[in-house]
UniProtKB/Swiss-Prot annotation:
InterPro entries found in the cross-reference section: Ribosomal_uS15, Ribosomal_uS15_bac-type, uS15_NS1_RNA-bd_sf
GO CC annotations on file: cytosolic small ribosomal subunit
GO BP of this protein: translation
Coiled coil: none
Function: One of the primary rRNA binding proteins, it binds directly to 16S rRNA where it helps nucleate assembly of the platform of the 30S subunit by binding and bridging several RNA helices of the 16S rRNA. Forms an intersubunit bridge (bridge B4) with the 23S rRNA of the 50S subunit in the ribosome.
Sample GO molecular function, one term: structural constituent of ribosome
Name of the gene encoding the protein in the UniProt record: rpsO
Complex and partners: Part of the 30S ribosomal subunit. Forms a bridge to the 50S subunit in the 70S ribosome, contacting the 23S rRNA.
Native source species: Thermosipho melanesiensis (strain DSM 12029 / CIP 104789 / BI429)
Signal peptide (from-to): none
Family in the record: Belongs to the universal ribosomal protein uS15 family.
Protein name as annotated: Small ribosomal subunit protein uS15
Keyword Glycoprotein appears in the UniProt entry: no
Tagged with keyword rRNA-binding: yes
């Protein structure tokens, strides 16, 4: 999935590129990509640190979304398959 497809799927209204839902979806795509990279290159510690920063940023945005709009939080979690 490329960036435009992710934005179209999660945007709230036309032209929405910065809502919490879109940000979480884009971060999730980057996290998945970096995770695959680290499976091939396990000693790439620089990328591993970047991955940890992305995960932390996604966690903060999800916490914000959970507090502000629980319904949207549940929908995003379900669509992305993040929580069990």
């Amino acid at each position: 999935m490329n960036k435009e497809e992710i934005i179209k799927e999660f945007q709230i209204h036309e032209g929405d590129t910065g809502s919490a839902e879109v940000q979480v979806a884009l971060l999730t795509a980057r996290i998945k990509h970096l995770t695959e990279h680290l499976k091939k290159h396990p000693k790439d510690y620089h990328s591993r640190r970047g991955l940890m920063k992305l995960v932390g940023r996604r966690r903060k945005i999800l916490k914000y979304l959970r507090n502000k709009n629980p319904e949207a939080y549940k929908e995003v979690i379900q669509k992305l398959g993040l929580r069990k």
